[in-house]
């Protein structure tokens, strides 16, 4: 149908090629074209075609010959499947299957690699209410090492969600009535657990994580209660946020920066007993932080990809236009560091950088040093956010723990205080914190020193101490320091509490994971405390210390040292049987198996008890065993076991103390420290996991299996499925391979909205569901709140079927190829899917399913059975029913984490308390350097001279923008210059004199450039832009015109510091060389060589492939330079005083280039270098000052009242042969399409040929003619736009989000017409006649698919800020532009020292004889001739070639 875009038509034809009935499949988006829009007699006419000589435009002349030899385009999605021999992304190369590790086990491996001493735990209250999605408590990657709390099984939880979302209608199942009062819940929400384990109120403040928890907390908190009442004091607010036992007077507060791998802006609060730091950093999981091209190191070479850093995922793509097809995704949640590599040679600057995760290291290469640093900084920000607990940074340093305050000179531009503090009362590890002050630094240092020196607790701590002999319940006064501690340390009655790890003191050896050592505990009676209690208000459970491999339990988060730590009683049904510890606890080795589902899984084993599977899989067993004393576990220490697996059976299972037989102990403390705290999964290679469905198996698993552990390592129970014991390794492999080959589907939870009778499938048990969900997240680098709902085996149909697996979650439709040579992945957001349609398969016996995607061609999948295809369609449609009406700004893609609500409220309350206390609000440097995008971590600590404040030059610059052409060529520069004025620079626009009033109206300096744009437009329309006929006429008639343009441009650019030129001006690059200033290019159409798009002046109606596209740039540049080189070189010698130049010497391809169109309209090609930047449109908004005529407003109101669509028609100031015929065609088409038209009749007769006796065509009441109106105001009122396709006009109509019809006339208009049609947001009008034009008008005003695509594209373009991106690019690339400035040799001066320059630069009239070969070789052999004379021989050869070339005419050069 005409209503479908070209890509959709192509796919539809493929899908229906083998249909026997010959009919096209039904599409909800298809249009029934009315009969009146059939082609009429004028269907082949074109009223805009030139009369008389039918000249061929460039895209029909020489490039037609090139096209015949060009390679056919291969831009199909199949290009994503090529085997990359140089890529190192093969998941099979990993040493340990990463997907089998739970969150804390991954963190354990992370700590092993980096010694990131992050010991504070975190938890999430996963309770879901009213269908809102919340991460389940057990799914948190940092909780699985914690004591177990009972969590309701997913089956029980699922019962609450059934029937909540009734699918009202479906093409597969009959509708069912919705229960009264039931509201549909979003499909992305997992089933709410029936009864979540809840921590006692005294165990911590439930505040930070989880929106529902935050709401309840604020409702019962004093802060929330005081929102509408009297202001709460700052001291009270700090007590609440930092969880002090009592309110403490705030001595002072200072804005400061925490210095770690980054500079983090926040506030320091000094109270009576604490030094506190607070900073708010929302985790933005959906914001795109940075995009660009990088080269990724593979096995044998570097491969260039398009990278997108979104949230905490770094994804890279082979094709930037196919963002649904990532090459791979790197999850930065488990990243450790990012850093630029050291240069191999001193003095060089390295453009490579590495990103280290807990399992591998990725190496990337940027195009420039600045780009590499920016990528590293952006990734470091993400790593910092993911390593910090919660959405705010909180640090509480007890003053009695502080050893000293020192002034540091680590930063040159700020005063920095180094605080050395004892971390905890067990290891007495010393940490260092650096706080930088841009203002009041000395005041802060003085106050800190006074507080430390005069504090009574600190003074008391300076007295000699004795070895500790404190009992468990001993009071503070009797608490002594450890014997392992320094000889003189303060009383440690409270630990440092922080949500992130500090900088470790260089002279203090912190225990490392790589050592697998247990931190010694010298006091057998002292309770095992958390090393650092997190103050993240939502995390009430604390994970055990990873660095020490010791157990810790959840304690009251109050710093009171005398209170007993409260334990949590185990909930029934949460623990599975585990392999008990060895009887000899003195030789117990605490090992963290990578196959365990709980990272806190502890197994005691020696060499005799290690199973074969464990020996094969565990590298830690080859290390020296760590012996732990039994005293390390005090009798007073209780351990509560918290399972991360929510799918365990609810059958009660006791936990046993070490050395106790399971059948002889009548009363076992479930919190005994001897109880193992994890379960082993043989899928990962070695431990045993037993299902709880059989009491006999429970007894077997509970009995000590020291002598049978080798056999137990290979066995597991699958009683629910098979009832027999099978070999885990071999069976797991067999199940995977046989399941993949057999195909099928699996569902992991009950489909919401379906009654029991509607369930057409068998659901997997909860154990397999959890494992499948973990694998799903691992494959696609999703966050832990993404829950897998269903999976299907199917083939992605392309040129050849690509067999793989479909994964469906609440928010994504994903596909992963299972073919050995393919790495194809698809990540398709559900919100981008319009519909799913059942189709016939391409192959006999297969059943097809077409996924209709918004703004993209359909994806076609083939299933082995019809029922599998139908179930997949049902699953997708059910999710679409719940998500189709969600707006982007209301969904989770708004950029701010939904869990940030509580932290944001906490931050706002603290800000209010600070204002209420009349804090000094003087603006300081820390606020000035805040990032433009409201980034809460604006700066990365780096070279302060190179990276401070976005590379902005210290002095204002005179920036000249040089361009020629029409109004559309000048308008973008006005928008750019207005922003440059705001930056403090002095911009100037050099263009035609007729635009001077318009430019000066905006306060911009102006310089005139000669040349009549109307004459230029005439030959462009008549001959085509830069065709051979165009060049011929321009060469014969416009030699004087070109001389005038060059000379006037030279005068207009005097005094410039930076030159920005449109390449069509032809003179700017030479002027910049003469002035020795940085030179930038900027244009509205592709001008840089690429295989992705043809040259904007060489667009054909049919795509010809990358070979044709690339050669169009070479051919155009060659023809263009050949035509003007003689005249340009004469002008260079005459006025600029420069020698002759050539294409290679100009180095145009190395110059920084700014493209002022949107990357959503023209995605940056893969082969463009980093200094070529697509910035976005430079819009000049004038709607605020425009007052529309009353009759125009009345016309539009009447059209809306009549229910008619409004269409804008205007072709600018195009000159055509017969304007009356065009006007008549527009009138007839508008009437035939039954729309209302706002007409801007700018077209006119060709110059000096207007016939005054020719009457104007009368306009009917359905058409309202205007002279002019700002596009940014007018297009918002329209339903569609028809215009000539200029870059600025196209950008304005697309930004308004309306379908666009383009009738191109010359130049880049053909390029943008093709882009609009390719994107499916408009129509490329090849001819203008009533039949074609009226049909196009009806289509753009009635095709819902096109309307929706245009609206979505408009939303994306409106989010761009092209002028700001352009300015930042200018700042960033200024050094590169300066590096390309060369000292030129004047004609009357000595030859340049540059060897390359000496070869070709000679005078025209200079006659030099060619020497014989021996005359050159002899001095070389004897090294007796001067080097300059040696170059003379080469100089003569070069002069002869150049001299011969100059004698040829441009036409003969072209013919040759």
From Swiss-Prot:
Annotated region described as Disordered, given as residue ranges: 1-229, 500-612, 631-691
Binding annotation for UDP-alpha-D-glucose: 966-967, 969, 1269, 1271, 1284, 1287-1289, 1308-1309
GO molecular function: sterol 3-beta-glucosyltransferase activity
Biased composition (Basic and acidic residues): 1-12, 23-48, 524-536, 544-557, 571-584
UniProt KW keywords: Autophagy, Cytoplasm, Glycosyltransferase, Lipid biosynthesis, Lipid metabolism, Membrane, Protein transport, Repeat, Steroid biosynthesis, Steroid metabolism, Sterol biosynthesis, Sterol metabolism, Transferase, Transport
Keyword Transcription regulation in record: no
Matches recorded under SMART domains: GRAM, PH
Domain GRAM positions: 236-283, 774-840
Reactions catalysed, as given in the entry: a sterol + UDP-alpha-D-glucose = a sterol 3-beta-D-glucoside + UDP + H(+); ergosterol + UDP-alpha-D-glucose = ergosteryl 3-beta-D-glucoside + UDP + H(+)
Biased composition (Polar residues): 54-63, 109-123, 585-612, 631-650
Annotated PROSITE patterns: PH_DOMAIN
Ranges annotated as biased composition (Low complexity): 510-523
Record-level GO cellular component terms: phagophore assembly site membrane
Gene Ontology biological-process annotations: autophagy; carbohydrate metabolic process; lipid glycosylation; protein transport; sterol biosynthetic process
Keyword Transmembrane helix: no
Location(s) in or outside the cell: Cytoplasm; Preautophagosomal structure membrane
Membrane topology, from the record: Peripheral membrane protein
Domain of life, per lineage: Eukaryota
First-listed, main subcellular location of the protein, grouped into a coarse class: cytoplasm
One Pfam family per UniProt: GRAM
Start-end of Basic residues biased regions: 13-22
Domain remark in the UniProt entry: The GRAM and PH domains are required for the localization of ATG26 to the preautophagosomal structure (PAS) and are involved in autophagy.
Family membership noted in the UniProt record: Belongs to the glycosyltransferase 28 family.
Record function comment: Sterol glycosyltransferase responsible for the glycosylation of ergosterol to form ergosterol-glucoside.
Name of the protein this chain belongs to: Sterol 3-beta-glucosyltransferase
């Amino acid at each position: 149908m005409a209503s479908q875009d070209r890509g959709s038509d192509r796919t539809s034809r493929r899908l229906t090629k083998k249909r026997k009935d010959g009919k096209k499949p039904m599409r909800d988006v298809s249009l029934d074209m009315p009969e009146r829009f059939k082609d009429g007699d004028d269907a082949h006419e074109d009223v805009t075609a030139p009369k008389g000589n039918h000249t061929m435009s460039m895209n029909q002349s020489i490039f037609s010959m090139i096209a015949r030899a060009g390679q056919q385009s291969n831009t199909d999605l199949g290009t994503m499947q090529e085997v990359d021999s140089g890529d190192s992304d093969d998941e099979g190369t990993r040493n340990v299957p990463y997907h089998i590790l739970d969150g804390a086990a991954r963190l354990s491996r992370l700590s092993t690699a980096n010694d990131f001493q992050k010991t504070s735990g975190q938890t999430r209250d996963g309770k879901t209410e009213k269908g809102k999605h919340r991460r389940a408590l057990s799914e948190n990657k940092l909780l699985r090492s914690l004591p177990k709390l009972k969590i309701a099984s997913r089956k029980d939880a699922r019962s609450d969600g059934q029937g909540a979302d009734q699918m009202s209608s479906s093409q597969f199942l009959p509708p069912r009535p919705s229960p009264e009062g039931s509201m549909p819940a979003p499909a992305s929400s997992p089933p709410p657990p029936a009864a979540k384990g809840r921590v006692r109120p005294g165990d911590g403040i439930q505040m930070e994580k989880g929106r529902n928890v935050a709401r309840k907390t604020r409702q019962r908190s004093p802060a929330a209660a005081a929102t509408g009442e009297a202001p709460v004091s700052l001291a009270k607010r700090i007590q609440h946020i930092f969880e002090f036992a009592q309110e403490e007077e705030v001595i002072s507060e200072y804005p400061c920066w925490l210095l770690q791998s980054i500079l983090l802006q926040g506030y320091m609060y000094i109270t009576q007993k604490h030094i506190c730091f607070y900073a708010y950093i929302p985790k933005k999981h959906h914001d795109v932080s940075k995009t660009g091209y990088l080269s990724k190191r593979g096995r044998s070479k570097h491969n260039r990809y398009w990278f997108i850093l979104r949230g905490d995922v770094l994804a890279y793509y082979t094709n930037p236009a196919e963002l649904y097809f990532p090459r791979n995704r790197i999850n930065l949640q488990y990243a450790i560091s990012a850093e630029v590599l050291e240069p191999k040679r001193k003095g060089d600057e390295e453009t490579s950088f590495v990103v280290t995760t807990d399992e591998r290291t990725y190496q990337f290469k940027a195009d420039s040093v600045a780009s590499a640093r920016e990528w590293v900084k952006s990734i470091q920000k993400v790593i910092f956010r993911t390593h910090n607990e919660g959405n705010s940074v909180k640090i509480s340093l007890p003053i009695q723990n502080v050893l000293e305050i020192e002034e540091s000179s680590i930063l040159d531009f700020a005063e920095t205080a180094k605080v050395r503090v004892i971390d905890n009362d067990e290891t007495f590890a010393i940490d260092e914190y650096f706080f930088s002050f841009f203002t009041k630094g000395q005041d802060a240092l003085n106050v800190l020193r006074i507080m430390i020196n005069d504090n009574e607790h600190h003074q008391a701590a300076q007295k000699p101490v004795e070895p500790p002999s404190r009992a468990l319940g001993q009071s503070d006064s009797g608490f002594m320091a450890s014997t392992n501690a320094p000889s003189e340390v303060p009383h440690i009655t409270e630990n440092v509490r922080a949500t992130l790890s500090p900088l470790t003191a260089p002279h203090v050896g912190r225990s490392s994971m790589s050592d697998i050592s247990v931190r010694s505990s010298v006091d057998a009676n002292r309770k095992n405390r958390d090393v650092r209690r997190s103050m993240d208000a939502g995390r009430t459970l604390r994970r055990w210390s990873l660095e020490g491999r010791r157990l810790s339990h959840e304690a009251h988060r109050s710093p009171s040292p005398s209170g007993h730590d409260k334990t949590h009683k185990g909930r029934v049904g949460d623990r599975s049987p585990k392999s008990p510890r060895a009887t000899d606890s003195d030789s117990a080795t605490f090992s963290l198996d990578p196959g365990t589902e709980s990272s806190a899984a502890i197994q005691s084993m020696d060499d005799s008890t290690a199973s074969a599977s464990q020996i094969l899989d565990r590298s830690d067993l080859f290390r020296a065993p760590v012996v732990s004393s039994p005293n390390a576990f005090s009798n007073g220490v209780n351990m509560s076991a918290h399972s991360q697996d929510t799918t365990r059976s609810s059958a009660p299972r006791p936990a046993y103390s070490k050395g106790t037989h399971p059948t002889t102990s009548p009363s076992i403390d479930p919190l005994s420290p001897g109880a193992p705290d994890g379960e082993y999964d043989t899928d990962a290679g070695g431990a045993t996991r037993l299902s709880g469905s059989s009491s006999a198996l429970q007894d077997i698993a509970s009995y000590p299996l020291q002598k049978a552990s080798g056999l137990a390592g290979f066995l597991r129970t699958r009683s629910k499925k098979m009832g027999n014991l099978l070999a885990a390794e071999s069976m797991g492999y067999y199940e995977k391979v046989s399941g993949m080959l057999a195909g099928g589907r699996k569902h992991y939870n009950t489909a919401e909205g379906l009654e029991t009778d509607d369930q057409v499938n068998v659901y997997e048990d909860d154990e397999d569901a959890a494992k499948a969900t973990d694998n799903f997240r691992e494959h696609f680098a999703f966050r832990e709140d993404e829950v897998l709902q269903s999976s299907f085996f199917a083939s992605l149909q392309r040129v050849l079927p690509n067999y793989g697996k479909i994964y469906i979650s609440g928010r994504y439709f994903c596909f992963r190829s299972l073919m050995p040579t393919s790495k194809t992945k698809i990540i398709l957001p559900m919100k981008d899917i319009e519909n799913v349609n059942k189709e016939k398969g391409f192959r006999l016996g297969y059943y097809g399913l077409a996924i209709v995607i918004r703004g993209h061609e359909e994806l076609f999948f083939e299933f082995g059975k019809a029922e599998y295809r139908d179930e997949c369609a049902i699953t997708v449609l059910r999710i679409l029913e719940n998500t189709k009406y969600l707006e982007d700004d209301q969904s989770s893609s708004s950029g701010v984490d939904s869990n940030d609500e509580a932290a944001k409220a906490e931050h706002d309350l603290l800000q209010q308390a600070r204002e209420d206390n009349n804090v000094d609000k003087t603006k300081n440097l820390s606020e000035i350097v805040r990032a433009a995008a409201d980034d809460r971590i604006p700066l990365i600590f780096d070279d302060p001279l190179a990276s401070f404040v976005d590379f902005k030059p210290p002095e204002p610059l005179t920036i000249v923008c040089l361009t020629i052409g029409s109004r559309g060529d000048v308008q973008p520069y006005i928008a750019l210059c207005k922003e440059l004025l705001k930056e403090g620079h002095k911009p100037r626009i050099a263009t035609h004199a007729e635009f001077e009033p318009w430019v000066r109206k905006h306060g911009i300096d102006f310089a005139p450039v000669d040349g009549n744009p109307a004459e230029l437009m005439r030959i462009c329309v008549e001959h085509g832009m830069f065709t051979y006929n165009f060049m011929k006429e321009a060469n014969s008639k416009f030699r004087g015109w070109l001389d005038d343009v060059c000379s006037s441009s030279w005068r207009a650019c005097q005094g410039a510091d930076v030159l920005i030129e449109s390449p069509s001006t032809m003179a700017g690059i030479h002027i910049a060389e003469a002035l020795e200033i940085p030179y930038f290019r900027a244009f509205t159409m592709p001008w840089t060589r690429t295989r992705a798009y043809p040259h904007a002046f060489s667009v054909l109606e049919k795509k010809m492939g990358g070979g044709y596209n690339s050669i169009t740039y070479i051919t155009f540049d060659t023809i263009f330079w050949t035509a003007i080189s003689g005249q340009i070189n004469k002008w260079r010698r005459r006025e600029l005083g420069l020698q002759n130049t050539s294409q290679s010497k100009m180095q145009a391809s190395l110059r920084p280039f700014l493209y002022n169109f949107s990357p959503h309209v023209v995605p940056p090609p893969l082969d463009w270098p980093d200094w070529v930047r697509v910035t976005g449109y430079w819009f000049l908004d004038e709607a605020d000052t425009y007052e529309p005529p009353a009759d125009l407003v009345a016309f539009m109101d009447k059209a809306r009242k009549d229910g008619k669509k409004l269409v804008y028609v205007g072709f600018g100031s195009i000159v055509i042969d017969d304007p009356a015929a065009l006007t008549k065609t527009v009138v007839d088409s508008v009437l035939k399409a039954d729309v209302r038209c706002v007409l801007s009749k700018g077209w006119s007769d060709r110059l000096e040929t207007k016939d005054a006796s020719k009457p104007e065509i009368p306009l009917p009441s359905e058409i309202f003619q205007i002279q002019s109106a700002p596009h940014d105001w007018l297009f918002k009122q329209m339903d569609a736009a028809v215009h000539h396709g200029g870059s600025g006009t196209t950008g304005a109509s697309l930004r308004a989000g309306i379908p666009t019809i383009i009738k191109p006339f010359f130049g880049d208009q053909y390029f943008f017409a093709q882009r609009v049609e390719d994107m499916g947001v408009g129509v490329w009008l090849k001819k203008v006649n009533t039949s074609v034009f009226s049909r196009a008008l009806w289509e753009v005003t009635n095709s819902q698919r096109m309307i929706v695509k245009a609206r979505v594209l408009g939303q994306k373009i409106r989010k761009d800020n092209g002028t700001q991106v352009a300015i930042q690019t200018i700042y960033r690339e200024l050094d590169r532009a300066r590096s390309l400035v060369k000292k030129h040799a004047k004609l009357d001066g000595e030859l340049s020292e540059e060897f390359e320059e000496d070869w070709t630069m000679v005078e025209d009239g200079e006659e030099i004889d060619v020497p014989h070969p021996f005359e050159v070789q002899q001095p070389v052999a004897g090294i007796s001739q001067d080097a300059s004379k040696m170059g003379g021989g080469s100089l003569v050869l070069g002069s002869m070639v150049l001299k011969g070339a100059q004698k040829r005419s441009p036409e003969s050069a072209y013919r040759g």
